[in-house]
Amino acid sequence: MNRYRHALAATPLSLAVVLTLASGQVTADMQTETVEYTVNGETFTGYMAYDDEAEGKRPGVLVVHEWWGHNEFAREQAEKLAAAGYTAFALDMYGSGKLAEHPEDAQAFMKEATKDIDQVKARFMAARELLAKHDSVDGSKIAAQGYCFGGAVVLNMARLGVDLDAVVSYHGALGSPIKAEAGKVQPRIHVYTGGADKMVPSDQVSGLVKEMQDAGADLTLVSFPGVMHSFTNPGADKVAEEFNMPIAYDEQAAKRSWEGTLRLYEDVFSD
């Protein structure tokens, strides 16, 4: 069955949770935890957010950061998800302390992290295991969303057949040397991209559509006309000015993509 929709406008790993570095309270009920963990001997630092007053277990959502690294924006997305009723884990794909302040550093971190797809999958799966085992989480209900670099990561996890209920990519690269295979893609996929995103050319958009259609994947792709790269991040305009980058925040695209994401989660987790 082809469940495609298009709207235009197991890798070896060694995981150990080493230490919860800090915990805090963002609101009366929201708890946050900075979690240090190891994958194949390397240390990573993630951020868990959840409502500890909510009854029972709930779905978990992984948040994969932009190419800058695990930053405040990623943590804010985890907090937004917690406020919406989920337990969210903003994972770390680069390693503790690797947070770029300059595009050259971001590019170097990303290149090192993605040099081996087995390494990418191991780091993702370690975070997935951490989230699924959290006391507040129903481990059978897990989604993942990513931004820019993170958007490409979550799409590749879907291509690789990782057990996820939903995947959401925001302004992420859509092309990949990994290709989806028929019957292998498990999650429902939402892709939100900017029609004027110079980092995601139109051939990537059409290529993803064909790839997922051929694989029988459940894809919803929304392209916002005139919208540029990094449209979800309010800090994009400052970065664009500082480094002369073709990126820009777009309030309406950010709002509509977030609303679409919440509708997706409500739907896939309703059982």
Language-model features, listed with the residues they occupy:
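Acidic catalytic loop of the alpha/beta-hydrolase fold
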Residues: 196-200, 229
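Active-site loop/turn elements of alpha/beta-hydrolase fold enzymes
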Residues: 86, 93, 172, 224-226
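C-terminal catalytic histidine-bearing segment of alpha/beta-hydrolase fold enzymes
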Residues: 213, 218-271
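Bacterial N-terminal signal peptides
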Residues: 10-22
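Primarily recognizes the serine-hydrolase "nucleophile elbow" in alpha/beta-hydrolase
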Residues: 124-185
